[in-house]
Each structure stands twice: as structure tokens, then as C-alpha cells.
UniProtKB/Swiss-Prot annotation:
Disulfide bonds: none annotated. It comes from Xylella fastidiosa (strain M12). InterPro entries: IF-2B-related, IF-M1Pi, IF_2B-like_C, Initiation_fac_2B_a/b/d, M1Pi_N, NagB/RpiA_transferase-like. This is Methylthioribose-1-phosphate isomerase. Substrate binds at R58, G59, A60, R101, Q204, N255, K256. It is an enzyme of class 5 (isomerase). The lineage of its organism: Bacteria, Pseudomonadati, Pseudomonadota, Gammaproteobacteria, Lysobacterales. NCBIfam families: eIF-2B_rel (TIGR00524), PRK05720.1 (NF004326), salvage_mtnA (TIGR00512). The gene is mtnA. Keywords: Amino-acid biosynthesis, Isomerase, Methionine biosynthesis. Pfam families: IF-2B (PF01008).
Length: 354
């Protein structure tokens, strides 16, 4: 590395996309990265709803955390004697927040948690709501640091790693999931090389991941998504480390499109494959990946780059957002509850059925 390693990983965790001022919310506008670093102020729950809908904030954990603050801002627009009355008056705003990104699991989870908290609150319900929103953000960072330690312990000293999409501070309250493992591995001197796939069509790897790592002084090398197999064949990568949008009861994992082909390629080349996500991402009610509905986005996203069209008129495109990696191709699933190696239904049940 180009500078001495610190005794811990705090040096490698400088980016914060969500800032609560005590009066309003400031969100790093991820649509404008990496060339413009600009925060957007949200003074109402409607501002927060729009920020979620328009991708100012992205990443399932971050969306959930922001929704919690959206509920706090909504509370300023009503009067109520206790939490029960407040919940009744806040319900329309909470439903609008949920509708902004209805497929985000963390968003629904946070709003359900805020509802439970409110229903038990008394005259101090506003303060209780704000404390709960703070707790949600704080718990996210704590879980991410825990996952970072668990995941890094699996990585031999001197390893190279490849990641996909963006799973760092920009997608969470801080530190990140898969990128948190990489941060911890760098701090411990275990990781010698970091590669990031560009992640078409939104280019989260190219626009966000390598920028985020650069802010923390971590050297990263960008590759085209299509270069992954050649990179693995070269021997420069020992682990592929990715996040997850949903993990099924048998270990099958839905994640950003392109993850499945990385898992297949890794298995062929003897490269280990790690999935890192919070326990809230595990869906024990979905038995296997076949039951996951894969979201399709506008084909127009594939027909250009950064607003510049690169494809002739009249060309069709197919644009699924996620794919499903079978648990059999995953060497380790890492959550804040620990590590499941070679995951299967029995191990998942033992860890998460509570």
C-alpha cells in the first residue's frame, strides 16, 4: 500500500451520504457523483419521498434509514397527544414513503419498526421517533463493522478481491456490507489488490465504488464487467465479494444483475465467492431463488451512457435489474450473526429461524 496501515479501519470510512442536522436531513446526491459532490436538503417527508424516488439516495439499507428520518420530518406536520393518535395521522405519509421504492425490503422493515415504536409511545412520541431513527442508523453501522470483521477473517494475507455494484458507505449508514469487508481487509493487511466491475447499465462500480474507495485512500482498479473471467484466470483475484438484495431460506441470493455470472466464473477458476448482507436481508419465507420476482427496468437504460445514446434507433433491449445466484455457488454468507460456509437450508434455518 502507498501509506502505513492504521491499527483499525476508521481511516477507511470517511464518506457519509446521510446527515441529520437535528432540524433537517442532508443527502449526498448520488446521481451527480463522481464529478459533483453536492448535498440535497430535505425539510419535509415529501422531500424525502422524492429523494428516494429519484435515486438521490440508493442502496437498500440507506433507503430504509432515510425513510426513518422521513417519518420524523412528517411528525413535525401534525399534532397528537400520544403515539397512537400520531400513527393514525402519519399513516398517509408513511404509505407515500413506502410507495417511493416498494420493492426495497429495508424500507418496509424500517417503516414497520417506526409504526411499532409509535404505537407504544406516550406524550413524548416525537422524541421517541427521533431516537428510533438514530438507533436504526447507528445499528446499521455497528452491524456493518461486525460483518467486516467476520468477512475479513476469511481472507488470506496478500489476497486480491473483486467486487460488484456499490455496497459501501454510499449504500448504507456507513462502512458498508461487501465494501465493509474490503475496508476491514485493507486495514488488517489481508487485501493487497482491489478490483471493481463497472456494473452496467447504471455504472455503480465506475461512478460510486471506485470514487468511494478513493476518498478513503484505498487503491482500486476498475474493470469492464466483461473482463472478470480473464482477470480471475490471471490469478490476481482470490475472492469475489458482493452484497445482496434478498437471501432465500436455502442460501440462494438475489443481487445486482451480473452477480450470477461472476459466481459461475469464480467457481470455474477456483476463486472463492462471498455474499455480505445484514440479517434483515434474509427472507426465510422465500424457500428458493425461483420464487423471487426479478424486476425489469426501462430498456432505454441500455441504449446510452450518461444521457448520450449509443445504439441505433429501433433496437430492442432486455434490462433485468437482478439475478439469482444459487447457494451452491456461494462459499460464504456473512451477516452480523456470523459466517455460514457452503450455505444450505439446514444451516440457514439454524442461524435465522427465530
Amino acid at each position: 500500500m502507498h501509506h502505513p496501515l492504521p491499527p483499525d479501519d476508521t481511516l477507511y470510512d470517511q464518506v457519509r451520504p446521510i446527515l441529520w442536522t437535528g432540524y433537517f436531513l442532508k443527502l449526498l446526491d448520488q446521481r451527480k457523483l463522481p464529478f459533483v459532490v453536492e448535498y440535497v436538503e430535505c425539510h419535509s417527508s415529501e422531500d424525502v419521498t422524492q429523494a428516494i424516488r429519484t435515486l438521490i439516495v440508493r442502496g437498500a439499507p440507506a433507503i430504509g434509514i432515510v425513510a426513518g428520518w422521513g417519518a420524523v420530518l412528517a411528525a413535525r406536520e401534525i399534532e397528537a397527544v400520544d403515539g397512537i393518535e400520531a400513527l393514525r395521522k402519519l399513516e398517509p405519509a408513511l404509505q407515500r414513503l413506502h410507495a417511493a421504492r416498494p420493492t426495497a425490503v429495508n424500507l418496509a422493515w424500517v417503516l414497520a419498526r417506526m409504526r411499532r415504536t409509535l404505537s407504544a409511545a406516550h406524550a413524548d412520541w416525537r422524541q421517541v421517533m427521533e431516537c428510533e431513527a438514530e438507533s436504526i442508523a447507528r445499528e446499521d453501522i455497528t452491524a456493518n463493522r461486525c460483518m467486516g470483521a467476520y468477512g475479513a477473517a476469511l481472507i488470506p494475507i496478500g489476497s486480491g478481491v473483486l467486487t460488484h455494484c456499490n455496497t459501501g458507505s454510499l449504500a448504507t449508514a456507513g462502512f458498508g456490507t461487501a465494501l465493509g469487508v474490503i475496508r476491514a481487509g485493507i486495514a488488517q493487511g489481508r487485501i493487497a489488490r482491489v478490483f471493481a466491475g463497472e456494473t452496467r447499465p447504471w455504472l455503480q462500480g465506475a461512478r460510486l465504488t471506485v470514487w468511494e474507495l478513493q476518498q478513503d485512500g484505498i487503491d482500486a482498479t476498475l474493470i469492464a464487467d466483461s473482463a472478470a473471467a480473464h482477470l480471475m484466470k490471471s490469478g490476481q483475484v482470490q475472492w469475489v465479494i458482493v452484497g445482496a438484495d434478498r437471501i432465500c431460506a436455502n442460501g440462494d441470493t438475489a443481487n445486482k444483475i451480473g452477480t450470477y455470472q461472476l459466481a459461475i466464473t469464480a467457481r470455474h477458476h477456483g476463486v472463492k465467492f462471498m455474499v455480505v448482507a445484514s440479517a434483515a436481508t434474509v427472507d426465510m419465507d422465500t424457500t428458493a431463488g425461483e420464487a423471487i420476482e426479478i424486476e425489469q427496468r426501462d430498456p432505454e437504460e441500455l441504449l446510452g451512457v450518461s444521457g448520450v445514446r449509443t445504439v441505433a434507433e429501433g433496437i430492442a433491449a432486455w434490462n433485468p435489474v437482478f439475478d439469482v445466484t444459487p447457494g451452491a455457488l456461494i462459499d460464504a454468507i456473512v451477516t452480523e450473526r456470523g459466517v455460514i460456509q457452503s450455505p444450505d437450508a439446514a444451516q440457514m434455518r439454524a442461524t435465522f429461524s427465530n
